[in-house]
């Protein structure tokens, strides 16, 4: 079994309602234990996309998107 490192992952989910002029940002931070930074980034990106999809099924939101902003290995 490969050694797993701890990574701190940060990202945002952008949501906008149809009748509003501004975008709301949801900040997400978590710690993951993965073998490589690529695996941590892919896992976190998948998690953010699923979380954003929850907003996407609500018809009140006209625009939904997400972005991984940081993945860093902790010491």
Model-based region annotation:
Residues 49-75:
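Short, mixed-charge low-complexity intrinsically disordered segments
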Residues 22-38:
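A short, exposed loop/beta-hairpin motif centered on an aromatic-Gly-Thr core
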Residues 2-26:
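Short aromatic-glycine-(Arg/Gly/Cys) micro-motifs in beta-strand/loop hairpins
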């Amino acid at each position: 079994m490969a050694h797993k490192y701890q990574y701190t992952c940060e990202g945002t989910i952008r949501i906008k309602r149809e009748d509003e002029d501004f975008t709301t940002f949801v900040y997400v931070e978590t710690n993951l234990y993965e073998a490589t930074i690529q695996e941590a980034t892919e896992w976190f990106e998948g998690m953010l996309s699923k979380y954003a999809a929850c907003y996407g099924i609500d018809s009140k939101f006209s625009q939904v998107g997400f972005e991984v902003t940081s993945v860093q290995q902790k010491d």
